[in-house]
Amino acid sequence: MARPEEGPELRLARLWWALGWALVVFITVSCLEPPRYVPNLHLWDKAEHALAFGGLALWFGGLVRRSRYLVVAFVMLLFGGGIEIAQGVMRLGRDMDIMDFLADGVGISIALTALYLGLGAWASWVERLIWPSREPS
């Protein structure tokens, strides 16, 4: 069991964090490169923002202790705001849009709710599926 001041005890913590940061890089590149290079998912743009930022918040929320969920949400909001500002100043065919930022916030809020309702242990659950406890029953 993890100590209260630490995140969940994860065997694959480095892998989970590395995959999370790969997702951050992917979302950053997808949001900042010219639109002609980005695949069209044929979803509503605001839904894409909510899914991307909510997914990131849920991902990283599963890697930290419960008391850090609000920090994860705040960092994700800063990330979303930074992306919108960068889109506005880069002039590569992207526009700064407050509605995209609000959609990011909706996704993050949904993820935060899911984390508090119990999905925050998702990484531990996956690891238990991969490596079941060898303790005698």
Protein language model annotation of sequence segments:
Residues M1-F101, G105, S109-S137:
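Bulky hydrophobic segments
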